Amino acid sequence: MDAFDVIKAPVVTEKTVRMIEEENKLVFYVDRRATKQDIKRAMKELFDVEVEKVNTLITPKGEKKAYVKLKEGYDASKIAASLGIY
């Protein structure tokens, strides 16, 4: 899968903004067929960051969300600012 096909859009809520600031995590809507490895690869390709871990869930609406924790030394708030979340 292409990186642009994997990651669809950032999730922007009060909870996700808190996660960016306190836990160094970003939350995205992703393609339902994307695996955790696909999501890691897409994050590295699109944002040039190293990913520590990826947690995924499928919402009752059928959308897949990915909670992406970045490794030490990478700042989620900088990526969030470039995406227009702040």
Swiss-Prot record:
One of its GO terms (molecular function) is structural constituent of ribosome. The gene is rpl23. HAMAP family: Ribosomal_uL23_A, Ribosomal_uL23_B. This is Large ribosomal subunit protein uL23. SUPFAM superfamilies: Ribosomal proteins S24e, L23 and L15e (SSF54189). Keywords: Ribonucleoprotein, Ribosomal protein, RNA-binding, rRNA-binding. Pfam families: Ribosomal_L23. Part of the 50S ribosomal subunit. Contacts protein L29. The keyword Ubl conjugation does not apply. Binds to 23S rRNA. One of the proteins that surrounds the polypeptide exit tunnel on the outside of the ribosome.
